[in-house]
A protein has these predicted regions:
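Short, cysteine-centered beta-strand-loop-beta hairpins and adjacent loop/turn segments enriched
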Residues: 86-96
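Short, surface-exposed coil-to-beta transition loops
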Residues: 66-68, 95-101
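Short beta-strand segments enriched in hydrophobic/aromatic residues
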Residues: 26, 85-87, 117
């Protein structure tokens, strides 16, 4: 996995609103740890099908989701992407928040995507 690959993951997959493209970057036994949920890690989605469902729910919750100002770093089998998440929720509330993903790679694919973002009060 390279910084160019991570850029394509965000521009073609997330900003293209294309779950199929996103999943081409994920390993078959991938894990997505979302920002919110009952577990210490948020909510842990395990396996290709569960991760696909979780990604699709993000597009449903924020139909105009867009990641901007992304910067990507890769060192061996680990990587980080910093970004600004922007989107309008189905209730009309606009969200813009700075965040990052911490990645673990395996075989040139994303094995773990652990997401974090700031907790804005306004």
């Amino acid at each position: 996995m390279t910084t160019k690959d991570l850029d394509a993951f965000f521009t073609k997959g997330w900003n293209g609103h294309d779950v199929d493209v996103l999943m081409t970057f994920m390993s078959e036994d991938c894990i997505f740890e979302s920002v919110a949920g009952p577990e210490v890690c948020g909510t842990r989605h395990v396996g290709h099908d569960r991760v696909r469902e979780a990604f699709a729910r993000i597009f449903t919750a924020f139909p105009d989701v867009h990641f901007r100002d992304a910067r990507h770093f890769v060192a061996g089998d680990r990587g980080v992407s910093e970004w600004v998440f922007a989107g309008t929720a189905s209730n009309g509330k606009r969200t813009e928040v700075q965040g990052c993903d911490v990645f673990t790679f395996d075989g040139g694919k994303i094995a773990v995507k652990s997401s974090y973002f700031k907790n804005r009060t306004a």
